[in-house]
Amino acid sequence: MDRLLSVVVSVYNEEKALEDFYKETTGILKDIDWAYELIFVNDGSSDQSLAILERLSASDRAVKVVSFSRNFGHEAAMIAGLDYSSGDGIICMDADLQHPPECIP
């Protein structure tokens, strides 16, 4: 049975960074020896972040989206993502690429 890595990603008004984050992160994750899930937590974004996340989720079954009705803050978003994750290992990241995906392996 494959080990599962959960990557929990806090998102707040990151429409400009989401596509790049997704491409860079999945590119890295596909090369590791674990199955993975990307759990994006939309923290009440007012831009197009949620629409982008829903599109990514529709095209990639490894992408899961949790969405808050309003901004509850970074810590609440991370806790929700941790609660939703089912991995044997968990990594927390921000969607703004502050944490380079290259650090995952």
What role is predicted for each listed range?
Residues 1-105:
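Structured catalytic core of nucleotide-sugar glycosyltransferases
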